[in-house]
Amino acid sequence: MSEQQTASLGEFTFECGESIPDLELAYETYGEFTGDNAVLVCHALTGSAHVAGGRRRSDTSGQAHAWWDDIVGPGKAVDTTDYYVICANIPGSCYGSSGPPSTNPETGEPWGTTFPAVTVGDWTRAQRRLLDHLGVPHLHAVVGGSVGGMNVLDWAKRHPDHVNRVAVVAAAARLDPQCLALDAIARRAITTDPNWNGGDYYGEDPPVEGLALARQIGHVMYLSKSSMQDKFGRRSSGIDAGRDSFEMDPAAGFFPYREVESYLDYQGEKFARRFDANSYLYLTRAMDNYDLASGYESDRDALAAFDGEALLISFTGDWHFTVEQSEAVADAFRESGTDTAHHVVDSDHGHDAFLVEPDRVGPPLDDFLVDGVAGKAVSDTTPDDDDGDEFAPVHTSLFSD
């Protein structure tokens, strides 16, 4: 199992104009570097550098379980016997990299909300600096899902000559207003928790109730209506089941505590034990702010300098980052002259599909890394298909021919 390491990368100026004296990035590497086989994996919103290798020791910073262990590893889609894989915890997070809960060396106290505002562009710049530290001048590929996919797009835009292939999974060029609104409500849940205290809660009781509510909102975004119906329906966990989880008004005792409520309460409470509330504020704002076309006339212009190959993977049940949004990014790549494929997976799992359906994500990703858009398991959208379907069929099994 790869061990988490920390790189001290010196003074770093964020896009907001503020600086910190020493940017620290927690990272893990897998496989051996041969000079042309480096693959950077960009994690999603609340992920960590621990992308592969099973379960960590309980005393190790970050998520206990590797978050993409079914995709990254020996003999898997991102095969660590062939590739040198790097995954770094992004600035602003709380899994070992510089962020609100880390220590300000000038005060000896946590930064809290005095930590500079972070952007997706800052993540890319920090990753580039880490790669320089590791002696990796060029990448075979950058791969990422969700906001990690936005991070991938930023690589194609910001460092087009530094990477051969980009794989953008369940992402978009920017968030739509509905997702912006839900993220704003989630942040409000945190900042209205009395324990948030303007972000100065370290050493005191943290705003766990607000953070748990924020995560519950996120989980609703990650599931599809179909998956929620299949998973929960309207089933009850029992009238009294919720009393131990939160305070209830007397009239609530007449009504059932439903399984969907129980699920959200469990997920919220679990998340609040492992993540930092200020980091959640910082990272959701970075995601909300990202716009591929920023500084350019269009998405196509933003990608014009990229001369590699691009793969988009999207999921029909994902309303957080829709198939149509991925198709728009694919079109921008195509219009800029990039060899591009958009592989659509028919799935009811919502946004979570990129994490929970490795048998659908693995084959196209594997073949793309090896053969580019000509890969055997890589399908592409064909709006002019004779059957009238908007999108082409996709492979449905890891073992399909």
UniProtKB/Swiss-Prot annotation:
Entry EC no(s): 2.3.1.31
Record field: catalytic activity: L-homoserine + acetyl-CoA = O-acetyl-L-homoserine + CoA
Biological process annotations from GO: homoserine metabolic process; methionine biosynthetic process
Annotated InterPro entries: AB_hydrolase_1, AB_hydrolase_fold, HAT_MetX-like
Active site: residue positions: S146 (nucleophile), D318, H351
Domain spans labelled AB hydrolase-1: 37-358
Amino-acid positions noted as binding substrate in the UniProt annotation, renumbered to this chain: R215, D352
Pathway info: Amino-acid biosynthesis; L-methionine biosynthesis via de novo pathway; O-acetyl-L-homoserine from L-homoserine: step 1/1
A Pfam short name: Abhydrolase_1
Role, per record: Transfers an acetyl group from acetyl-CoA to L-homoserine, forming acetyl-L-homoserine.
Protein name as catalogued: Homoserine O-acetyltransferase
Organism for this UniProt entry: Natronomonas pharaonis (strain ATCC 35678 / DSM 2160 / CIP 103997 / JCM 8858 / NBRC 14720 / NCIMB 2260 / Gabara)
